[in-house]
Amino acid sequence: MVNPLIKEAKEKMKKTLEKIEDELKKMRTGKPSPAILEEIKVDYYGVPTPVNQLATISVSEERTLVIKPWDRSVLSLIEKAINASDLGLNPVNDGNVIRLVFPTPTTEQREKWVKKAKEIVEEGKIAIRNIRREIMKKIKEDQKEGNIPEDDARRLENEVQKLTDEFIEKLDEVFEIKKKEIMEF
């Protein structure tokens, strides 16, 4: 049976890993990805609505995203929302769809994105280590209170450390994949 503290640590670390993966997906790279539009909201009848709930977003050609709204009346609203965002892309509205052409990024831009990805992953590592510290503290408290013997406490601490190492390694792998994606032409 898995100890509840180990289970708690694993669940929290897994959530942290998923959060970091989601943040990296939303990051702009040289390739177009519908995920970068997830944070862009359009004022649709007074309600801030994500673009992906108002349109079909697809990748067309090598460096183009095509946004095809289900209701053509929102074309200009989507265009304004993209212009107001910090994506640095110029939407082209042809009356039916909006095209977002991704320019080939410079080496300097790519290096900046890699640096940003590294910062995001570092935040994840810090969160994982904080989870480890929190669980280790609970193990020590349980041991002090006499709820678990010293040998079991040491075994649990080793398990928590092993989990920590495992998740930090996964974060490093996620970073390497993102770095490769950013740097490839």
From Swiss-Prot:
Disulfide cysteine pairs (residue numbers): none
This protein's UniProt keywords: Cytoplasm, Protein biosynthesis
Xref: SUPFAM superfamilies: Ribosome recycling factor, RRF
GO biological process: translational termination
Predominant location: cytoplasm
GO cellular component, one term: cytoplasm
Keyword Cytoplasm: yes
Gene Ontology MF term list: ribosomal large subunit binding
CDD domains according to UniProt: RRF
UniProt-listed InterPro entries: Ribosome_recyc_fac, Ribosome_recyc_fac_dom, RRF_sf
Protein localization: Cytoplasm
Function: Responsible for the release of ribosomes from messenger RNA at the termination of protein biosynthesis. May increase the efficiency of translation by recycling ribosomes from one round of translation to another.
Similarity field: Belongs to the RRF family.
Protein name: Ribosome-recycling factor
The species this protein was found in: Thermotoga neapolitana (strain ATCC 49049 / DSM 4359 / NBRC 107923 / NS-E)
